[in-house]
Amino acid sequence: MALRTDWNGVFPAMVTPFRENGSFDEASFKALIELYISEGVKGVVVTGSTGEWYSMSDAERATVWEVAVEASSGRITVIAGTSAVGTREALALTRTAKAVGVDGCMLLPPGGIFAARNEVVNYFHTLAGVGLPIMVYNNPPRTGVNMDADMVAEIAKSEEIVSFKDINRYLYAASEIIYRVCDKLAVFTGLEPYASSVLPRGAVGVVSTISNICAANMVSYYNAVISGDSATAYKTQKLIDQLYHFLPTLGAPAFVSVKAAMKLLGRPGGEIRLPHLPANEALIGKLREELRRLKMMTLN
């Protein structure tokens, strides 16, 4: 398969809106997709970690994919998170995603088992047999697997492997992967502040959790970096950096804080689902204060 030149830009790692009773809030999800499209994103990743896939049944994930395809109507790229612990489970999910009509899928290595190098390579080659374009996701803290350039190049030998998302905080290692495979794979960073460093090296986009809070700003940041507009890049990156470093200080899982921020900003992120617990008043108060300081919300 040829390099996916249409996979580029800002792809929000979408939250999945839930109602207070835990059910999927389809109306809010559709509203979010429309909001992101209006803010200039080029694609979305649904039912990834930010989308709380680990709390959803396979049927629920399939429903989210169907709604995403319907709501986007071909206007943006839709990537379905089809990660699972076992190969059989991931194969079944990826086949379902293909049948639904998504543009591609995003997959972590098998999680929680610290898979060996050859097992990870075989895992992705096996899943490539489904025939759906795959974005390989390197997230060492979640999987215990840190892919280096040699491993990614080996995985990329399968034609259906078309993209790579990396959250490696070691810039040299991230750069080595980009240099090695950017002629074959559309490389995305999952670390928003790193975009200004990896895009000039050959990466093509950002899969962004923070975009749930400020997609328009993230798009402006990406466009400024790509076009060489250093003044706008500085202004927009400053906001992103501050959000990126502030959210972990709240002491809650990122997705809890992101949904709380969305609610404060009037963005339809919905409720969090168990095992996560809703943001408490102390966290919400700190969030409100920071969003005001960053001039992202009014004082009322």
UniProtKB/Swiss-Prot annotation:
Keywords: Cytoplasm, Lyase, Plasmid, Schiff base
Subunit structure as annotated in this protein's UniProt entry: Homotetramer.
Name of this chain's protein: Uncharacterized DapA-like lyase
Cited function: Upon expression in E.coli complements a dapA deletion mutation, but this may not be its physiological function.
EC number: 4.-.-.-
Organism: Rhizobium meliloti (Ensifer meliloti)
Record-linked CDD domains: DHDPS-like
Keyword field contains Signal: no
Signal peptide range in chain numbering: none
